[in-house]
Amino acid sequence: MSDRSSRRERITKETSVRVEIDLDGNGNSEINTGIGFLDHMLTLFSFNSKVNLDVFAKGDSYVCDHHTIEDIGITLGEAFKESLGDKHGINRYGTFYVPMDETLALASIDVSNRPFLVFDCDFKREKVGEMSTEMVVEFFRAFAFNAGITLHLKVLYGENDHHKIEALFKAFGRAIKEAISRSSDNDIPSTKGSL
């Protein structure tokens, strides 16, 4: 693992989550959350960001998927923030559009230590696979606030909910890749001198 890597665990009465992340990877992943569609989305994120990612989770799925998905977002966000360290030499910003058939999605990121989420997407279905569509925004909110990033996600247009969610995760991965890439200098990318 590189110097930009982290391992985080979160154990509560509702869930047990373990995340390993290496920002300087090649997109390898091993994902087992107990929620097949989320596994697919996290695999796509890893591949598109080129971040190596292992996620193992067990949760109270007999209740619903909320606790598991939110806790994965929290733990992944914490690991991401820890992996970045003091943020010397990163680009800081990343923006990417991804088309998927009839859908076009946008992700824009500022690794600013100013957590915020703007999420603009409507879903027609209650679930895609075993994953509640209402949990898409909850995952990204948990990630953004624990990673300390400003994250804007928008589906500009589209019909199929699977395509919308997949395009969002791919765009998110590509924007992360751009934001965490090393710039030509080793400065902190802020006039304040810190992030």
From Swiss-Prot:
EC nos: 4.2.1.19
Record InterPro entries: IGPD_sf, ImidazoleglycerolP_deHydtase, ImidazoleglycerP_deHydtase_CS, Ribosomal_Su5_D2-typ_SF
GO biological process: L-histidine biosynthetic process
Major location (coarse): cytoplasm
Keyword Amino-acid biosynthesis: yes
Origin: domain of life: Bacteria
Entry-linked PROSITE patterns: IGP_DEHYDRATASE_2
Protein keywords: Amino-acid biosynthesis, Cytoplasm, Histidine biosynthesis, Lyase
Pathway of action: Amino-acid biosynthesis; L-histidine biosynthesis; L-histidine from 5-phospho-alpha-D-ribose 1-diphosphate: step 6/9
Pfam families noted in UniProt: IGPD
Cytoplasm recorded as keyword: yes
GO cellular component: cytoplasm
Database matches in CDD domains: IGPD
GO molecular function terms listed in the Swiss-Prot or TrEMBL record: imidazoleglycerol-phosphate dehydratase activity
Subcellular compartments: Cytoplasm
Catalytic activity: D-erythro-1-(imidazol-4-yl)glycerol 3-phosphate = 3-(imidazol-4-yl)-2-oxopropyl phosphate + H2O
PANTHER family for this protein: IMIDAZOLEGLYCEROL-PHOSPHATE DEHYDRATASE, IMIDAZOLEGLYCEROL-PHOSPHATE DEHYDRATASE HIS7
Family, per entry: Belongs to the imidazoleglycerol-phosphate dehydratase family.
UniProt protein name: Imidazoleglycerol-phosphate dehydratase
Annotated organism of origin: Clostridium beijerinckii (strain ATCC 51743 / NCIMB 8052)
Lineage summary: Bacteria, Bacillati, Bacillota, Clostridia, Eubacteriales
Gene: hisB
